[in-house]
Amino acid sequence: MLVRFSVENFLSFKNLTEFSMVAGKMTRHSGHIAVCNHKRLLKGAFIFGANASGKTNLIRAISFARNIVLNGIERTNCDKKFFRIDEDCKDNPGVFQFDIFSQGHFYSYGFAISYAAAVEEEWLYQIDNPNKEFCVFLRSKQENDETFTISSDIQFKDGRQEARFSVYKDDISSSKMKQTLFLRDIAMRSPEDSPEYQPFR
């Protein structure tokens, strides 16, 4: 279930723009509210606005980011998707973030990509506790390098799982994987979809 979507430097969105399904304080239409782990979320929403105000581009942004998660950057057209009114934006990454509710937990997943079709950064946090985020993984590109560093708060109890995760980390840290999202790579290797990946299907 989508809780929030954020986008920056994509088509008509230069600055960070957010679409939220978190319910406001009004309680007039309580039947339109779903309560998930004590958080009130809208069951549905409409997008209103004047012509050429960005409604279609918001849908395009969600579709573009979802396509990258499901099919990979190499199968996604990234040409001229940056905010073209400002030429400086050509060299800035496009940023996409999904906050989702899946299998009883809240997650925040996002990535930043260059429009040369390469991952700059990628992150996945479990955000059940508003005061403390749990880092499932944070993938950051090294300065002046094409390789990545991976950090995580996961404490493995099973040595086999830790070894498996270590192999994933080593593989995705390579410069050869700069067009591959870590979340997609894990999902493709796993027999079952992870709860963080399922909402994108």
Where on the chain are the PLM-derived regions?
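Intrinsically disordered, low-complexity boundary segments flanking structured domains
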Residues: R4-E8, R84-D86, R164-D170
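Short aromatic-acidic-glycine turn motif
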Residues: T27, G72, N131
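Conserved P-loop NTP-binding catalytic core
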Residues: A34, H38-F46, A50, I59-A117
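Electropositive, glycine-dotted interaction segments
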Residues: S108-R201
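Short acidic, glycine-rich loop/turn motifs
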Residues: V7, F98-G104, L124-D128
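Pre-Walker A-like glycine/lysine-rich segment at the N-terminus of P-loop NTPase domains
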Residues: M1-F64
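A generic structural signal for short, non-catalytic loop/turn and secondary-structure boundary residues
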Residues: S12-K14, R40, D91, P130, ...
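Short acidic/polar mixed-charge low-complexity motifs
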Residues: F13-N15, Q103-Y107, N131
